[in-house]
Amino acid sequence: MKLMTNALMMAGSAALLLSTAISAQAAFVENEYICEDIYMEKAYDCANNAIIVEKNRLNKIYNRAYRRLNKVERRQLNTEQLAWLKKRDDKCHFEHDGPMNNTIVYAQIGANVCTATETQKRSKAIAKRYNIQ
């Protein structure tokens, strides 16, 4: 009886740990990038790092989704991705030819934060659509 109780207790503990791990894994961690509110040099690094983090996340999620798809679905996802990239770039793109000043640098920082935020939204949408943890 004692052996059976211990076995049931261990099985219950294992199930609890597994369900906790699964629910922790299932959460999509959203980053909030508030880079514009800090000293310029750190703000610039913050925005650039945000892009790196979010592009890496999107690449991982996209590739995991892509591997699950058949040929037709892959083409569809590629087409959607290209359209999304154009939309994101139209929304967030910043280009300046001329002398740099603080206003221009902060505009670039804002554009980079926009790119990171839009990329994060795309990662979340693909992860949700294809049930990627």
Give each language-model segment a name:
Residues 15-25:
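C-terminal segment of classical bacterial N-terminal signal peptides
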